[in-house]
A protein has these predicted regions:
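Acidic, low-complexity intrinsically disordered segments
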Residues: 1-180
Length: 180
């Protein structure tokens, strides 16, 4: 099976390429790829660098969504879903605006993907049981210590020569007013 992970660009200006923004490695997507079961072939498309294909040769797509890329992410998801491909969305905007995001995808992840929830989502997809929403707060997060981001997916993409590292993840508390 094939999983395609997409980092949307900020947007598009008429008759010009997509707006370029920071070209640092999308560490969240490489971490997600590291959490993906080995039976999935993983492809990374970073729209800030790569053109999007007209037709997708994949089984399922994951799109990371930040508030400033939301409009573009919804447009990408609409086209992919039109091709009959399931779309999963997650990221900070999904946590902040879940009622909005869920209208544009087949499944949504709230919170971080570690702790077994990402594997559960992909297994549910394989078994035709993909749920509309998954809440990572209901999963025990023990998997992160063993996650190696798939930096091989960055090859030949022209990212800034920086090695991004996460020194911490989230927060152990579940305050209702916080998006972390």
């Amino acid at each position: 099976m094939k999983l395609t992970l997409i980092q949307p660009s900020v947007g598009k200006i008429a008759n010009k390429p997509y707006i370029k923004s920071w070209t640092m490695e999308p560490l969240a997507l490489a971490t997600l790829a590291g959490l993906t079961p080995k039976e999935f072939e993983v492809e990374l498309i970073d729209e800030r660098i790569d053109p999007l294909p007209e037709f997708y040769n994949t089984d399922i797509v994951g799109i990371t969504i930040e508030t400033y890329t939301a409009k573009r992410a919804y447009s990408i998801a609409k086209e992919i879903r039109r091709q009959g491909i399931k779309v999963i969305m997650g990221g900070i905007h999904a946590n902040l605006m879940p009622d909005e995001v869920i209208q544009h995808c087949d499944s949504m992840l709230l919170g971080g993907a570690e702790g077994g929830i990402w594997t559960q989502m992909l297994n549910d997809f394989k078994n035709n049981k993909l749920q509309k929403k998954y809440d990572a707060n209901s999963y025990f997060k023990k998997e992160l210590d063993h996650v190696t981001p798939r930096r091989d997916l960055y090859a030949n993409k022209g990212y800034l020569p920086l090695g991004l590292v996460e020194s911490g993840r989230g927060c152990p508390f579940t305050c209702e007013f916080c998006a972390i």
